[in-house]
Amino acid sequence: MAVILLGNEHIWKLPFCRLEFVAILEKMLSFAKLQTIEVYLVSDTTIAFFNLHYMNCLGITNVLSFPMDDEDLAGSIILSVDAVCRESLLYRQPILDYCLSLLSHGIAHIAGYTHGVEMDKFCSNLLLPFKLA
């Protein structure tokens, strides 16, 4: 299992270093029984571009995920670090907790879940090792 982390210039805004970030994601992937994912850490401007280009939605979002039908790559997650920082304040959640909840959401989509009770349960289980469920 592996995490391909891109967009390292944005990680300084998050409350963990690159190695901690990758270790957390690898633990989540292990639970989700996924092999390899790409994670792009981006700005609001960049995620707005991807949101328009791939989802045909105008504006900023916090996370996008793209499952792939590839034995070497389960999927990609695009995470707006700007949105994580802003929304964690807005929702009064610690930035670490909020970031991990968005990552669990993206991983759930890559694992094949759609919004609903089963996905919520899956995300809660992904977060249990971090005591965030």
From Swiss-Prot:
Alphabetic keyword roster: Cytoplasm, Endonuclease, Hydrolase, Metal-binding, Nuclease, Ribosome biogenesis, rRNA processing, Zinc
Pfam families in alphabetical order: YbeY
GO process terms (BP): rRNA processing
Cofactors: Zn(2+)
Signal peptide: none
Coiled coil: none
Main function: Single strand-specific metallo-endoribonuclease involved in late-stage 70S ribosome quality control and in maturation of the 3' terminus of the 16S rRNA.
Protein family per UniProt: Belongs to the endoribonuclease YbeY family.
Name assigned to this protein: Endoribonuclease YbeY
Lineage of origin: Bacteria, Pseudomonadati, Thermodesulfobacteriota, Desulfovibrionia, Desulfovibrionales
Gene from which the chain derives: ybeY
